[in-house]
UniProtKB/Swiss-Prot annotation:
Family recorded in the similarity comment: Belongs to the EF-Ts family.
UniProt-listed InterPro entries: EF-Ts_dimer_sf (IPR036402), Transl_elong_EFTs/EF1B (IPR001816), Transl_elong_EFTs/EF1B_dimer (IPR014039), Transl_elong_Ts_CS (IPR018101), UBA-like_sf (IPR009060)
Cellular component terms (Gene Ontology): cytoplasm
Region (Involved in Mg(2+) ion dislocation from EF-Tu): 76-79
Recorded superkingdom: Bacteria
Organism: Rhodococcus jostii (strain RHA1)
Coiled-coil residue spans: none
SUPFAM superfamilies: Elongation factor Ts (EF-Ts), dimerisation domain, UBA-like
One annotated GO molecular function: translation elongation factor activity
Pfam families from the UniProt entry: EF_TS
Protein name: Elongation factor Ts
Alphabetically ordered keywords of this record: Cytoplasm, Elongation factor, Protein biosynthesis
HAMAP family: EF_Ts
Upper classification of the organism: Bacteria, Bacillati, Actinomycetota, Actinomycetes, Mycobacteriales
Compartments, as annotated in UniProt: Cytoplasm
């Protein structure tokens, strides 16, 4: 017969943030001694930190506020939609929006309710029971456009794009948000072809030439074939050279030009994807 009550379990859960079974086991091992149960859970939490550090974080969310985009990762989609996890992400992005830290390490060192952001994350990790990782942050001065995409209706956004642009008015803001949606969908890497590193372009030309030769294309046709395939590569990775996902008859550049918008830079975060 258990030497503790349901009220003891409830109180222990509220005090420690641990799960129901963990609290029941702790009370059973402590033979109903509440203080000992608390101590056991604290010790177990400290030990679990090392175990959690070795686990992978393939789930999570992206969140944005006032020119900041950040990604907070966890292990399971169950935690990704957990209220405590969502509140943690919101509190962190609020701090980031106010301070505009340069990188993740700078954000982790900022104050959040009297503790560092990193400490709060570790405490929530112990409470939730999963490894939590603040993996990415970007901060733009603006004006900015944001697009957040959900993979599933019951989960928080897993893809986020932050675009910094020049332009004025509602039409400019709408066009910039359209560009953010474009990046989310087609994963552009550069704003214009001038941003593509020369060594990458040279490598694409080499691949195009070798492929054309392997296909037995006539020598006199090679220059045109190579140019066409390199241009195809640009359409894959350069935002302004892509066909718009909103209007396939127009390029992204044409839509931006009509609205008087110039994209200065953008970032795209996707939960589970490498940096």
């Amino acid at each position: 017969m258990a030497n503790y009550t349901a009220a003891d379990v409830k109180r222990l859960r509220e005090l420690t943030g641990s799960g129901m079974m963990a609290c029941k086991n702790a009370l059973a091992e402590a033979e109903g001694d509440f203080d000992k149960a608390v101590e056991q859970l604290r010790i177990k939490g400290a030990k679990d930190v090392g175990k959690r550090a070795e686990r992978t974080t393939a789930e999570g969310l992206v969140v944005s506020k006032d020119g900041v985009l950040l990604e907070l990762d966890c292990e399971t989609d169950f935690v990704a939609k957990n209220e405590d996890f969502l509140k943690l992400a919101e509190s962190i992005v609020t701090v980031a929006a106010a301070a505009k830290p340069a990188d993740v390490d700078a954000l982790k060192a900022l104050d959040l309710d009297g503790k560092t952001v990193d400490t709060v994350i570790q405490e929530q990790s112990a409470k939730i029971g999963e490894k939590l990782v603040l993996s990415k942050i970007a901060s733009f001065d603006g004006p900015v456009a944001v697009y957040l995409h959900k993979r599933s209706a019951d989960l928080p956004p897993a893809v986020g794009v932050l675009v910094e642009y020049t332009g004025e008015g509602d039409a400019a803001a709408e066009a910039a948000r359209g560009a953010a949606m474009q990046v989310a969908a087609l994963k552009a890497k550069y704003v214009t072809r001038d941003e593509v590193p020369e060594d990458i372009v040279a490598n694409e030309r080499h691949i195009a030439e070798e492929t054309a030769r392997a296909e037995g294309k006539p020598e006199q046709a090679l220059p045109k074939i190579i140019e066409g395939r390199v241009n195809g590569y640009f359409k894959d990775v350069v935002l302004t050279e892509q066909s718009s996902v909103q209007d396939s008859k127009k390029s992204v550049k044409a839509i931006l030009d009509e609205a008087g918008v110039t994209i200065k830079r953008f970032v795209r975060f996707e939960v589970g994807a490498s940096s």
